[in-house]
Swiss-Prot record:
It comes from Rippkaea orientalis (strain PCC 8801 / RF-1) (Cyanothece sp. (strain PCC 8801)). This is Transcription antitermination protein NusB. It holds the Pfam family NusB. One of its GO terms (cellular component) is cytosol. Involved in transcription antitermination. Required for transcription of ribosomal RNA (rRNA) genes. Binds specifically to the boxA antiterminator sequence of the ribosomal RNA (rrn) operons. GO terms for biological process: DNA-templated transcription termination; transcription antitermination. Belongs to the NusB family. GO terms for molecular function: RNA binding. InterPro entries: NusB-like_sf (IPR035926), NusB_fam (IPR011605), NusB_RsmB_TIM44 (IPR006027).
Length: 211
């Protein structure tokens, strides 16, 4: 059984995983049921898992081909090992995504479904309505990066955190910590460190602007 989590933490995960699939008007957003959010989230997780497994299979195939050539090209051995290592990481990532998909409905059952739904929809609505403004804020603090070049999951984690700080009156520290936790769960080591740095710069810029 998954551990009981606070409703808002589950809401953030639901919003993160549903953003790409729910683009409703504010009126239609209010009509979305919790089951629709769960379905959208599970679809996102399973799609990501399939993509990861396909990439892993490709890495294994290429690694095997390089091993077959290793008798004449010793450098191929190291390259093949790197490919197999990457394939293992991708496979583990896919397994983790599928585990989250299995856990999600039960996590919501253990929490207050009303609270989970309400805050998830509030987050989705805020991000969708104010996306241009949110993205401008993020572009201003990205160093040597463009927002549209980031992995989608990282972009949406950043958008949710900025929406919470700017429009939902969530304290900076809480929004950043929750974003880092989501990144640890759905991104990678580089991803969560990068997200932490971007949000720290964003809140510092906000502090200077407001003073």
């Amino acid at each position: 059984m998954p551990p009981r989590q606070q409703p808002r933490r589950i809401s953030r995960e639901l919003a993160l995983l549903s953003l790409s699939q729910i683009n409703a008007t504010p009126e239609k957003l209010e009509q979305i049921e919790i089951n629709n959010l769960i379905l959208a989230a599970i679809r996102t997780l399973t799609t990501e898992s399939q993509d990861m497994l396909e990439t892993a299979a490709s890495e294994v195939t290429q690694g095997n081909e390089r091993l077959l050539k290793s008798e004449t090209q010793s450098a191929n051995v190291q390259s093949a090992r790197a490919m197999v290592s990457e394939a293992l990481k991708l496979t583990q990532g896919a397994i983790n995504r599928l585990a989250h998909a299995i856990e999600l409905p039960e996590m919501i059952q253990l929490a207050s479904q009303y609270e989970v739904r309400e805050y998830a929809l509030e987050l989705i609505g805020a991000v969708n309505r104010r996306r241009t403004e949110i993205d401008q804020q993020l572009e201003a603090v990205l160093v040597d990066w463009q927002l549209n070049r980031l992995p989608k999951i990282d972009r949406d984690i950043l958008r949710i955190a900025v929406a919470e700080i700017l429009f939902l009156e969530i304290p900076n520290k809480v929004a950043i910590n929750e974003a880092i936790e989501m990144a640890k769960r759905y991104s990678d080591d580089e991803g969560y460190r990068f997200i932490n740095g971007v949000l720290r710069r964003f809140t510092e810029r906000l502090r200077i602007t407001n003073n």
